[in-house]
Amino acid sequence: MKTIIVIGVGAQGSTIAKRMNDHPAVSEIICADFDSKAAHELSRSLDKAKALQLDARDVNNVIKAAEGCDLIVNGLPLEFNLIVMEAALAVHASYLDMAGPMESIGFVESYKLIFSEWHKKFEEKGLTALVGCGSSPGLANVIARESVDKMDTCDTIGIFVYEGVWTERFTPFWWSPEVAFGDMAFKTFRYENGAHVTDRPFSRPVMMKLRGIDREVRMVDHEHDEPVTMGLLADKVLKGVKNVDFKYGGSGVELAEVLYKMGLLSTDVVTVKDTRIVPMDLVLKLCPPAPKYPAEIKSIIDDGVILEEGAFLVRAEGHKEGSAVRIDGYVNAPGLVESFEKSNLSHEAYLTGQSGAVFVQMLVDDAFSEKGLFVPEQFPAAARRYCFQELAKLDITVDETEESY
């Protein structure tokens, strides 16, 4: 029997806690959050859980909270990752998060650091740490590796995510607006011709026809983990891939791009009529928060859903048996209304949270037990098969097509 602490019980963390509450090999779940109300509300709905108010800015607080736990699930913002990793090592617990670190040394450099020094730390302690285990990064990486393994060599991997959910009530984001705007205003990363390249936000726009959308949609480069980790692991697990990019599109991207071009996502102080203002602070003050509780999501749905459309594609291109080959993996998952009917979650929380829960379950079930620090594209075939099988039970599936040309 295993004890799990979930630190950060927002949409993804709470989903994982609920799923693990039903797992027969889990004896106790600690729901820890700075927001005491959120922790207690979640714990009251789970028969194996207890609530804990936690300020994770101090590693000693995290160590004290996690003492005796077998696994730490980190649902906090990126800046907490290394703090929580340090605590996991201190209490001899395995570790999982849903996106990698972005330390001041740089996105690529921070991944190099955890792939080397932190991998060794977890390996020497006989522990497993999984980084970037949500939907994207996470499921996207598993799909990419699955496709690449069918090829002799791989040239290009592209991850394309389009989100177009329009509701009568203005709801620009279904996850933290602070994280969303911050990510979109950050420089982009891609892996190009065997090297990591940075670019300006919203760079290299393309029009694409994606399955399930009856028109071409605009997609732009976006800061994300996959080009970084896949580039670093290109020769080890992705058959020498030379190009990896992540493109994003949809209503939230379009809004953010307009605000960015107006300077409203800047964190530099400006003076307006003798008042000093940080534009990003103003935007975040005025932006509606993401719906957090079921009653909030239900209220938005009841007010009216105008349009639900989206696509999640992982495309790998390379060579197989002397011919050029393209393998497309389209993810199928419940939309907003269906996700809420199934689990009182938004579509965003359902896909990312349930994907994260399957990765956690994989550790609980010892379906992946290698020691050290890993990202999902490093999973062997058996672990990938486990992920696909368990996700299918949650109506998250992948349609794969292969085309030679």
Predicted regions and their residues:
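Conserved N-terminal Rossmann-fold NAD(P)-binding element of oxidoreductases
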Residues: 4-8
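Hydrophobic/small residue at the entry helix of a nucleotide-binding pocket
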Residues: 12
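Helix N-cap at the beta1-alpha1 junction of Rossmann-like dinucleotide-binding domains, i.e.
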Residues: 34-37
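Rossmann-fold cofactor-recognition segment
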Residues: 46-58
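Conserved Rossmann-fold cofactor-binding substructure of NAD(P)-dependent oxidoreductases
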Residues: 56-68, 80
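N-terminal Rossmann-like NAD(P) cofactor-binding module of classical short-chain dehydrogenase/reductase
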Residues: 70-75, 95-96
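Rossmann-fold NAD(P)-binding glycine/threonine-rich loop
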Residues: 99-127
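C-terminal catalytic/substrate-binding lobe primarily of soluble NAD(P)-dependent oxidoreductases
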Residues: 149-405
